[in-house]
């Protein structure tokens, strides 16, 4: 996943909102859960379910000599969504670039699978349709393939055994039953500034929210929200780094409401550039995908890049060139290849970038090695429509974006996406497709569980609030475990990132840039927005480089 939850992260509530090659089912049907509940390796009567553990993304550290040299403006290391989008943006003005990927497929954590009438995601599941995200889709020829969720579809949080709707607009605040009246009053007074003053040091998400909005908002909304976005621990996540826009409201306006009014005033007084008329106009707060899943975006960019995208190219070393720029050595299917480039963008995970950069800057490598990526499992299962509890049905159907589960509510699953309700053509008629996330910073023990154990946990959890207790066992569509899933923006994250960049500068690594979800943010939309930002940095450098 590049976030997201959950990242780049895959998440059902956010509106900001490391994978192995695809492995498909060997037969044209899915296996009932009852057939695998006591098995570690799944193979019953010829049926085989698609269950896999994502392999670590590794880059060889040994230097390799030889191979022809080629002069390039930029080499982008890593063909996840960040690297691909940087290349897409830059290629208009700097077509003399290359994107290299150690694995045999592009797209990073985006993993869309289609089989037997089901279409599901095993990494990020959707994106916020922001203008940068929509611009990228339109520029890649995907405007007609965009699909948007119903903005009126409810979102739920599990609390005291019931799935309770989250308010989607201000008029809902007085009536929703997720919080008590005292809790609502505490949040309201805190939002206008009647709360303890900031402590003068960087706060965790939990500290910031409890101080500004009270314990109920934290426990019943923000804690599960953090699980959905980061699969993280809000007592350790940095408010400034993880939710910077909200943090800035208090910083600039003295309170959350004060900052909101100030931001509105500044926007109204600032001339606004005309919106690109090519872009669709999403209604309300919704999320988006594509007709054939998120995979369509990296596939479209890959097709546009053509021979500029190199797969199964394993970076062995980077050295500074005497004539300026950098010398890169790769192990490729064709043998050892050497490249000469004026600039490099590292969009691989921070722990991979750390290993590659260590010969160039020990301090930068040490800083990048500090970021933590907890494991997350994506368990996709399907039930017949009649398995859904009657109270969860609207007009005979399950409707909504999905549900999140606070850690205090006695379930292990982080949350569930209603995949077949969110977007069209995700499951056959009469079937409900559910994408469930499990693991995260508070539950790394999932790495010791088998796929059947993960499915058993998810099925048991769902029968507590969504599925009828005596419903038939689910069919298992896919199980994917990401050992290092989502970078955690912990307290000190921004300082650590600044330390890495400063060390690179101190070591004279001009023209070497960092990108990816640990830099931009974990949501898919933030990766795309971050790609525009990094592309602007690189093109600015190349413009200056041309005059040296």
Swiss-Prot record:
InterPro entries named in the record: Amino_oxidase, FAD/NAD-bd_sf, Protoporphyrinogen_oxidase, Zeta_carotene_desat/Oxidored
Expression induction: Oscillating expression during diurnal growth. Maximal expression in the dark period.
Region (Disordered): 265-287
Keyword Protein biosynthesis on entry: no
Biological process annotations from GO: chlorophyll biosynthetic process; protoporphyrinogen IX biosynthetic process
One GO MF term attached to the UniProt entry: oxygen-dependent protoporphyrinogen oxidase activity
Pfam families associated with the record: Amino_oxidase (PF01593)
Compositionally skewed regions (Basic and acidic residues) per UniProt: 265-279
Co-factor(s): FAD
Annotated metabolic or biological route of this protein: Porphyrin-containing compound metabolism; protoporphyrin-IX biosynthesis; protoporphyrin-IX from protoporphyrinogen-IX: step 1/1; Porphyrin-containing compound metabolism; chlorophyll biosynthesis
Gene3D superfamilies named among the record's database cross-references: FAD/NAD(P)-binding domain (3.50.50.60), protoporphyrinogen ix oxidase, domain 3 (1.10.3110.10), Protoporphyrinogen oxidase, mitochondrial, domain 2 (3.90.660.20)
Keywords annotated in UniProt: Chlorophyll biosynthesis, Chloroplast, FAD, Flavoprotein, Heme biosynthesis, Oxidoreductase, Plastid, Porphyrin biosynthesis, Transit peptide
Signal peptide: none
Coiled-coil regions listed in the entry: none
Enzyme class: oxidoreductase
GO cellular component, one term: chloroplast
UniProt-annotated location(s): Plastid, Chloroplast
EC number: 1.3.3.4
Described purpose of this protein according to its UniProt entry: Catalyzes the 6-electron oxidation of protoporphyrinogen-IX to form protoporphyrin-IX.
Family the entry assigns: Belongs to the protoporphyrinogen/coproporphyrinogen oxidase family. Protoporphyrinogen oxidase subfamily.
Subunit structure, as described in the record: Homodimer.
Name of the molecule in the record: Protoporphyrinogen oxidase, chloroplastic
Originating species: Nicotiana tabacum
Gene name in the database record: PPXI
